[in-house]
Amino acid sequence: MKVLYLGCFCEPTISTFIKECTKGVITVSATTFQKALLAGCNECGIRPDYIVNVPDIGSFPFRCNNLFFSKSKFEYASIKGVNASFFNVTYLKKCSIYHTIMREAKLWLNKNREEKVTILVYSLIYPYLKAAIDLKKMYPNVQICCIVLDLPEYFGDSTSLLYRFLGNLETKRIYSLVPSVDSFVLLTKYMREKLNVGLRPSLLLEGIYNPVCIVPQKKRKKTILDFYRFDLTD
């Protein structure tokens, strides 16, 4: 069996460029998790065979100066991959991401038609999950496993009425896709019920620990304030 990883992280070859063109704070949680996940897979010798990646960045013009991101090849944790090209325009971005994922994934899947393939999708982000499911319909040798760290109704934090309206519509579209997912990696057991996992295979993931990142510290003497030593009546 082969594994195609469908991700959305800022891998090292593009991280500097993304920092330069991003307005405001860069969200790093998705990138941190995925880099740790892929590095861990490499250490365990069970790494994916290929990565199709569309980095998680803000949209033009409000959160990013860049209108278009070009295609580029990279290698991370001994895994070869491609940063797919896409238009980074607000509201058009998701459609562009869907089509570019389809294009890049088909190039790889066409070379692996004789193999069983699992598409490992990071998160329930609509264009990524929609692309994976449509690829499954096109290739009978494909199954889908989705990593779920958050539920779609909690995506984003905008108070805009339009944003919330569109977000609610997209949440419903995402949940309509979930029955087509074959297996799950879940952050909590409560997600099983919410996603109606049923008898489908699922794995609970409590977190990722990297001992290399832990810096040893010297033990220090602790000073404990003892309130009973004070006369509070003065």
Where do the model's predicted regions map?
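A conserved catalytic-core segment of Leloir-type glycosyltransferases
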Residues: 50-116
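Conserved donor-binding/catalytic core segment of Leloir-type glycosyltransferases
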Residues: 4-6, 218-234
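Donor nucleotide-sugar binding/catalytic pocket of nucleotide-sugar-dependent glycosyltransferases
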Residues: 171-217, 227
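Membrane-proximal helix-turn-helix segments that form the acceptor-binding/catalytic region
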Residues: 35-39, 134-138, 152, 164-184
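Short N-terminal targeting/anchoring amphipathic segment
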Residues: 107-128, 140-145
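Nucleotide-sugar donor phosphate/pyrophosphate-binding loop at the beta->alpha transition
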Residues: 29, 143, 153-176, 211
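Active-site proximal beta-strand in glycosyltransferases
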Residues: 2-7, 118-120, 135-156, 184
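N-terminal subdomain of nucleotide-sugar transferases
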Residues: 1-69, 114-115, 183
